[in-house]
Amino acid sequence: EESYLFSTVAHKVSAFSAAHPEAKVLRMGIGDVTLPLAPAVVAAMQKAVSELGKKETFRGYGPEQGYDFLRESIQGYYARHGIALDANEIFISDGAKSDLGNILDIFDTDNTVLIPDPVYPVYVDTNVMAGRKIVFADANAENGFLPMPDESVNADIIYICSPNNPTGAAYSAEQLQAWVDYARAHGAVILYDAAYKCFVSEKGLARSIYETKGAKECAIEFCSFSKTAGFTGTRCGYTVVPNDLKFDGISCNKLWLRRQTTKFNGVPYIVQRGA
């Protein structure tokens, strides 16, 4: 019956501030940006606006999967980090949050979901709303806030957020390999939230789950421009669904493409140019 956590916190803060205007509130709810968009982003968006105002360069409906120029740019980013992706494996979204919830449309409601605790509340709320069984993996001081696979637990869908929201703990490539091996052995799919990957600076820590062997057969990766470029209000992200990933013998890439073309009209051209 409660609303979404960050929405509830925002309403409570607003009510308190209205009743106590003299109080200085330290906001511990959703993490928002504090700096404006970069000049290069603003210039690209301004140019895109001008294009839409001219008959020769006007654009209507865009491709649901995203414009080629952005998908190919993301493809190049992964290539520079040693990860080869096909452009058709990249789906442009209006942010990681949307896709983290919407991706569940391609999975059955009788799937068991494994979620680390504590973690980003979207994972829990979307599955509670769908009626799925949830199993929690404790992230605590004893395990460095990085729970590892438990062979006694069977799950169909596994959420991993690294670096983690809210703890900041990040998995090494070696630790992620253990999760990939577990998922492949159990026929599970990993939903890997890489929204905070730009903050990884220590050697040995993974920025992408595709740095591990076999991940393309069991993992979907979600990324966001909110943390890398301050797009919390502009809204843009992307999701990688490998062609090699199959769940119960069915291509997740094809299922997600069908879902997106049916329920999503794509991210605005102006925003994608900025991204």
Short names for language-model regions:
Residues E2-D94, N102:
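N-terminal small-domain helix-loop-helix segment of the aminotransferase-like
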Residues T212-A275:
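Conserved core segment of the aminotransferase class I/II
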Residues H20, A130, A185-H186:
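Helix C-cap/helix->beta junction micro-motif
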Residues T34-A38, P166-A169, C198-F199, A229-T232:
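Short catalytic/ligand-binding loop motif for oxyanion handling, primarily in non-cytosolic enzymes
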Residues K24, T112, K133, D156, ...:
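Proline-centered loop/turn at the N-terminus of a beta-strand
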Residues E56-D181, K197-T212:
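Conserved core of the PLP fold type I
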